[in-house]
Swiss-Prot record:
Protein name, UniProt field: Trp operon repressor homolog
Record lineage: Bacteria, Pseudomonadati, Pseudomonadota, Gammaproteobacteria, Vibrionales
Gene Ontology annotations for the cellular component aspect, listed alphabetically: cytoplasm
GO biological process per UniProt: negative regulation of DNA-templated transcription
Alphabetized UniProt keyword annotations: Cytoplasm, DNA-binding, Repressor, Transcription, Transcription regulation
Subunit structure: Homodimer.
Known role: This protein is an aporepressor. When complexed with L-tryptophan it binds the operator region of the trp operon and prevents the initiation of transcription.
PANTHER family, sorted: TRP OPERON REPRESSOR (PTHR38025:SF1)
Entries under Pfam families matching the protein: Trp_repressor (PF01371)
Record-linked Gene3D superfamilies: TrpR-like (1.10.1270.10)
Predominant cellular place of this UniProt entry's protein: cytoplasm
GO-annotated molecular function: DNA-binding transcription factor activity; sequence-specific DNA binding
Subcellular location(s) per record: Cytoplasm
DNA-binding region in chain numbering: 59-82
């Protein structure tokens, strides 16, 4: 026993995920690491960010749409506020492209 956690920094976890992605095993890794509830929470956060960045709905409307509490929406909003406009534009682009490519894959 080493006496300390092997992964003690967020960058180490990101490197682990990047390594798995390079091997096309990222889905397996995240499925093994996260419970179904944690995966649902992550999907909710992705949808929260997408809706907040679109800016079409109020936080209360997003809460009702996604079935999450207003406090959860507020936490997501506060996190987004800590990022630059360029970072938010990049995230929106990635979310849009990923959603479109997934929809195309489902039709096949």
């Amino acid at each position: 026993m080493s006496g300390s956690a092997k992964y003690s920094d967020w960058s180490q976890v990101m490197a682990l995920i990047a390594n798995a992605a390079e091997q096309n095993k990222h889905q397996s890794l995240l499925t093994m690491l996260m419970t179904p509830d944690e995966r649902e929470a992550l999907m909710a956060r992705v949808n929260i960010c997408h809706e907040l960045l679109q800016g079409d709905l109020s936080q209360r409307q997003i809460s009702q749409l996604l079935g999450v509490g207003v406090a959860t929406i507020t936490r997501g909003s506060n996190e987004l506020k800590s990022h630059t406009d360029d970072e938010k534009a990049w995230l929106m682009e990635v979310l849009e492209v990923s959603a479109k490519s997934d929809q195309g894959a489902r039709k096949e």
